[in-house]
């Protein structure tokens, strides 16, 4: 039977341009992160439900649980498009997945570049976030544990200095403050005591009333912002490796989805050609 010049070569009925390897690799790739996203949302929702209503509303902007829920929901929606799109060979869902993942990757890249170029503004924003967290230190147990962990890990106290704790109503040094913690700092600011079996939670009592030299004998007096900046400078290669580790899965997801979309389009063209070929033997 003659074939019209320029028409595609004939393929068997069982032939498919869509590679099962690419299809199911993309599916299981998204399934893994889909499960992770559901766990993140579940943990975030559980953490929110365990808090008192007043505390939950007071520190909404600096609540780690909210961040966990938001990131989890966005990841869930994104990986849903990837999972269903690859399994059902749906071009629309796959292109949505690829586009969103590309936007996320570019936003991360832009944030890194802008953070490096406008480091002073980033420093000011970080200081604002830390001060806001200090204000709500006693309002949220998760936030309190996060701050305590950060101060102990980086051997620091407050944002700029230990006196930043006056921003908190319980640690404020004003004369009319009835709190027993007036002019104090949290125990996580205290220097570690060797062979101490029980943590002295009152070790920071009255530390804000002391000058820098006197306070430095008992607590960390350096602010956490400077410590954080120094830590970043000392661990640039490690942070670069982490950034690369985050970028590679995103680039792999973008690449696999684009390859699969191209294969699906070729398969659609083949099906259309076969239909026309059966309808017109001279095609």
From Swiss-Prot:
Protein name: Tetraspanin-33
Disulfide pairings: 156-224, 157-189, 173-183, 190-203
Cytoplasmic face of the membrane: 1-24, 86-96, 257-283
Glycosylation sites: 172
Source organism: Bos taurus (Bovine)
Family to which the UniProt record says this protein belongs: Belongs to the tetraspanin (TM4SF) family.
Gene responsible for this protein: TSPAN33
Regions of this protein lying in the Extracellular compartment: 46-64, 118-235
Cross-referenced InterPro entries: Tetraspanin/Peripherin (IPR018499), Tetraspanin_animals (IPR000301), Tetraspanin_EC2_sf (IPR008952)
């Amino acid at each position: 039977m003659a074939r019209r010049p320029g028409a595609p070569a004939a393929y068997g009925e069982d032939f498919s341009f869509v590679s099962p390897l690419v299809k199911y690799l993309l599916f299981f790739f998204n399934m893994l992160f889909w499960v992770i996203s559901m766990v993140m949302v579940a943990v975030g929702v559980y953490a929110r439900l365990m808090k008192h209503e007043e505390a939950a509303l007071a520190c909404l902007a600096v609540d780690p649980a909210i961040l966990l829920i938001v990131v989890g929901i966005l990841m869930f929606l994104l990986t849903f498009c990837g999972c269903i799109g690859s399994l059902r060979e749906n071009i629309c869902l796959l292109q949505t997945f690829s586009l969103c993942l590309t936007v996320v990757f570019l936003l991360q890249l832009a944030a890194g570049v802008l953070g490096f170029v406008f480091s002073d503004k980033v420093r000011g924003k970080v200081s604002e976030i830390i001060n806001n967290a200090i204000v709500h230190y006693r309002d949220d147990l998760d936030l309190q544990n996060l701050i305590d962990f950060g101060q102990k890990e980086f051997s620091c106290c407050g944002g700029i200095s230990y006196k930043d704790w006056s921003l908190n109503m319980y640690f404020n040094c004003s004369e009319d403050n009835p709190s027993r913690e007036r002019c104090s700092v949290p125990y996580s600011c205290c220097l570690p005591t060797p062979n101490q079996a029980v943590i002295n939670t009152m070790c920071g009592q009255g530390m804000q009333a002391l000058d820098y030299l006197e306070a430095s004998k008992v607590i960390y007096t350096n602010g956490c912002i400077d410590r954080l900046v120094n830590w970043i400078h000392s661990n640039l290669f490690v942070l670069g490796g982490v950034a690369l580790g985050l970028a590679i899965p995103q680039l792999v997801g973008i690449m696999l989805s684009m390859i699969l979309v191209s294969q699906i389009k070729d398969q659609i063209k083949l099906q259309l050609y076969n239909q026309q070929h059966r309808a017109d033997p001279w095609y």
